[in-house]
């Protein structure tokens, strides 16, 4: 058997993190009363789960299996997103709103390119990571856009 690639732990962490992301966005989607926000949350939830499956698949292609990780923080956040808290409060729990709303057009360092810092990553894994980075950034843009729309709708009602 070939030597274990240095990035196996990273693939495992991403797969677990994205599975948790699915749980978060699905919980929020299931509880929002906003018919315009729900499809955005559903798209993000599906994207998160697809990322989890893609990274788990890559692990198996490399001869390894996913090591599931439990998180008390995840369970706590899922409970919050299933609660009757407002969508505005739920956006805030993801760091969207307030100051983020005003500065959302300014490119900010997100650290995602650090994922590709390992020069031993094979081309297939690198391509998967590149797509992941692009889609994660798009998810951030979609959340900011959805938040702005929510704020506009809320202000129009007042």
Where are these regions (language model features)?
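Non-heme di-metal
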Residues: 2-158
């Amino acid at each position: 058997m070939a030597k274990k690639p240095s990035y196996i732990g990273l693939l495992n962490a991403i797969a677990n993190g994205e599975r948790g992301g699915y749980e978060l966005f699905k919980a929020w989607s299931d509880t929002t009363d906003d018919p315009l926000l729900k499809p955005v949350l559903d798209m993000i939830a599906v994207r998160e789960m697809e990322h989890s499956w893609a990274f788990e698949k890559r692990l198996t292609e490399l001869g390894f299996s996913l090591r599931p990780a439990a998180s008390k923080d995840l369970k706590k956040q899922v409970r919050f997103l299933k609660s009757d808290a407002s969508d505005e409060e739920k956006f805030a729990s993801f760091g969207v709103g307030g100051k983020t709303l005003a500065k959302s057009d300014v490119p900010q360092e997100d650290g995602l390119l650090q994922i590709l810092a390992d020069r031993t990553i094979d081309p297939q894994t690198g391509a998967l990571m590149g797509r992941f980075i692009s889609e994660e950034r798009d998810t951030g843009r979609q959340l900011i856009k959805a938040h702005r729309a929510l704020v506009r709708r809320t202000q129009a009602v007042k």
